[in-house]
């Protein structure tokens, strides 16, 4: 049964230690869709499954980096996330692929299931993923232990890449979520945008960078009380 203390989202820089188990448990256990259509896995088992997977990565000496929602939550006390996103090379992925059930894959991603835990592997065959893995990683002390995660700059670059892809697919609802994540990071952290724009030149077109600059400039404008 759930034995985590409730952590209220503040949508600000994180002040409390993040527990991966709690975030993934809460996102699955309290997902209204699961209550409506049925749970595909017992959420009470997810915490120990998360620990087992992280221990497996350590045991096999896998070189990886946590990205996506869990990495974002390490910086911002926000909504929970129901899966685990892992940045990894194909060589390192081959060390653990026999321990998971692959559900889908393409050149950039491999989606898998580990005893009910959903895992998305983001492969460094993608140029921007490779850059983040090599240059924009750090460590974070989760409740479960110290693990590698993407830096804020790394998360921003990956969100930029995802936003472009989502626009091309017409998935504008998810675009809104990703843009909001970037806005919250911008409002809570001092970010070296000039460095990000410089790095972006190697991955995005001038037109794409121009649009991202407009977005960031809008987020940086002083806020006023519209209802005063």
PLM regions with names:
Residues 2-228:
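Compositionally biased terminal segments of proteins
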């Amino acid at each position: 049964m759930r034995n985590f203390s409730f952590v209220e989202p503040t949508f600000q820089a994180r002040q409390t230690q993040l527990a991966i188990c709690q975030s993934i448990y809460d996102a699955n256990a309290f997902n209204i869709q699961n209550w409506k259509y049925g749970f595909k896995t017992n959420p009470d088992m997810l915490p120990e499954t998360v620990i087992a997977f992280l221990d497996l990565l350590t045991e096999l000496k896998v070189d990886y980096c946590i990205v996506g929602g869990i990495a974002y939550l390490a910086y911002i006390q926000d909504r929970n996330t129901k899966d685990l996103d892992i940045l990894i090379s194909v060589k390192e992925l081959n060390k653990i692929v026999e321990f998971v059930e692959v559900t889908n894959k393409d050149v950039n991603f491999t989606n898998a299931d580990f005893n009910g835990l959903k895992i998305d592997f983001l492969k460094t065959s993608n140029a921007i993923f490779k850059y983040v893995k090599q240059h924009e990683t750090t460590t974070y002390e989760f409740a479960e232990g110290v693990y590698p995660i993407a830096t804020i700059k790394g998360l921003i670059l990956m969100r930029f890449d995802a936003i472009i892809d989502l626009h091309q697919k017409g998935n504008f609802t998810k675009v809104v979520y990703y843009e909001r994540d970037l806005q919250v990071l911008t409002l809570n952290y001092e970010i070296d945008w000039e460095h990000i724009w410089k790095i972006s030149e190697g991955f995005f077109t001038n037109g794409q960078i121009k649009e991202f600059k407009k977005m960031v400039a809008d987020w940086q404008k002083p806020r006023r009380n519209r209802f005063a």
